[in-house]
Amino acid sequence: MTNIRKNHPLIKIMNSSFIDLPAPSNISSWWNFGSLLGACLALQIITGLFLAMHYTADTTTAFSSVTHICRDVNYGWVIRYLHANGASMFFLCLFIHVGRGLYYGSFVLSETWNIGIILLFTVMATAFMGYVLPWGQMSFWGATVITNLLSAIPYIGTNLVEWIWGGFSVDKATLTRFFAFHFILPFIITALVMVHLLFLHETGSNNPLGIPSNPDKIPFHPYYTIKDLLGLILLILPLMTLVFFSPDLLGXXXXXXXXNPLSTPPHIKPEWYFLFAYAILRSIPNKLGGVLALIFSILILAIIPLLQTAKQQSMMFRPLSQCLFWILVADLFTLTWIGGQPVEHPFITIGQAASILYFSLILIAMPTVSLMENKMLKW
C-alpha cells in the first residue's frame, strides 16, 4: 500500500497534498476553515447538481419549479435548504478564513493570497447569481438593482447593462444566462482552489507565531485529518439545525413571493453576507463613487501586503494591532447591520461613519500602529 501511495502518478499527488504533507506542529483551529471551505464547496456542488435536475430557467416556471422541488421531489426541501444555508456557512467560513489571514499575516504568501482574493470575488458572483434563480421578489429586484450599478460606468455603462440583461430589463434572457453561469462557476472555483493549494504547498502553511516552522513539522495525516474532521462535525451541527428547524431564518421574506416587475419591495437588500459591502455602497451619495467604494471594499485586500509595515508577521505579540483588528471586525458587524436597515436618518450617518472607519483602519491606522510597535519593541 505504501508503494502505490508514493509511486502511483495520481495517488502520489493526493499523498503529498493530504497525507504526507509536512505541516507546522502548532497551527490552531483557525487553520481549520480552509478544509471546511472545501467541504462547503463539495456540498454546494452536489446539492446544486440535484437542484439543477428539477429546476427550469424560465421566468414563467422558475418559481413554481422551486416550489415543486420543495413539495414533490423526494427530500427536495432538504436539498434546497442545504444549498441555501450551505451558502451562508460557506461565507461564514470565508470571512473567518480571510480574517485569520489578516490576523496572522498569511498575506505575505502573495500568490496564495491573490488567488484567494480572486476566489472571493468568484464565490460572491456565484452566490449573487444563485440568489436570482428562484425568481422571487427579492431575486428579481436584487438582480435589477445590482446589475444596474454598472450603468454608473461612464460612456459604456448603459450599453453594458443591456448587454448583461440581454434586453431592456431583467427578463428570460437574464435568468437563463445567470443559471448557465451559476452552474459553471463552481467548477471554475474548484480549479482555482487547486491553484490556491498548489501555491500554498510551494511555501508551506503559515503558523500562529508567524515564524519559519521548517525545523518542526508533523505529517498532515493523522494529526490534522482528525482535527479537520472535528471541525467538519462542528460545522454540520449548526447547518443541520438551520435546515431542519428554521430554514428561512437567514433569507428575506420577500423572496417567498413570486417576482412582480410592477411592484417594488419597500426595502431591497441582499443576503446577509453581502450586507457589509451593500452598506458601503449606500453610504456614498454618488452612484459611481458608491460602485467604486463597493469594489474597493473587497479589492483593498490586495494592497494589504503593500501596507505591511510591521517587523513581525503575526499579530500574536502585537496588542495594539490586535485592538485595531477587533475594532475592524466590530465595524464589519456594524456595516452588516446597517446594510439591512432602511435608508433613514440615524442609519445613513452610522453607515457613513462605519464606512470611513473601515477604510481608514486598513489604509491608515493599522500601518501607523505597526510602525509604533516596531519602535516600542526597538526593532
From Swiss-Prot:
Source species taxonomy: Eukaryota, Metazoa, Chordata, Craniata, Vertebrata
Recorded topology in the membrane: Multi-pass membrane protein
Quaternary structure and interacting proteins, as annotated: The cytochrome bc1 complex contains 11 subunits: 3 respiratory subunits (MT-CYB, CYC1 and UQCRFS1), 2 core proteins (UQCRC1 and UQCRC2) and 6 low-molecular weight proteins (UQCRH/QCR6, UQCRB/QCR7, UQCRQ/QCR8, UQCR10/QCR9, UQCR11/QCR10 and a cleavage product of UQCRFS1). This cytochrome bc1 complex then forms a dimer.
UniProt keyword terms in alphabetical order: Electron transport, Heme, Iron, Membrane, Metal-binding, Mitochondrion, Mitochondrion inner membrane, Respiratory chain, Transmembrane, Transmembrane helix, Transport, Ubiquinone
Disulfide bonds: none
TM spans (from-to): 33-53, 77-98, 113-133, 178-198, 226-246, 288-308, 320-340, 347-367
Miscellaneous comment in the UniProt entry for this protein: Heme 1 (or BL or b562) is low-potential and absorbs at about 562 nm, and heme 2 (or BH or b566) is high-potential and absorbs at about 566 nm.
Cofactor names: heme b
Binding site for a ubiquinone: H201
GO molecular function terms listed in the Swiss-Prot or TrEMBL record: metal ion binding; ubiquinol-cytochrome-c reductase activity
PANTHER family: CYTOCHROME B
Protein name: Cytochrome b
GO cellular component, one term: mitochondrial inner membrane
Biological function: Component of the ubiquinol-cytochrome c reductase complex (complex III or cytochrome b-c1 complex) that is part of the mitochondrial respiratory chain. The b-c1 complex mediates electron transfer from ubiquinol to cytochrome c. Contributes to the generation of a proton gradient across the mitochondrial membrane that is then used for ATP synthesis.
Binding site for heme b b566: H97, H196
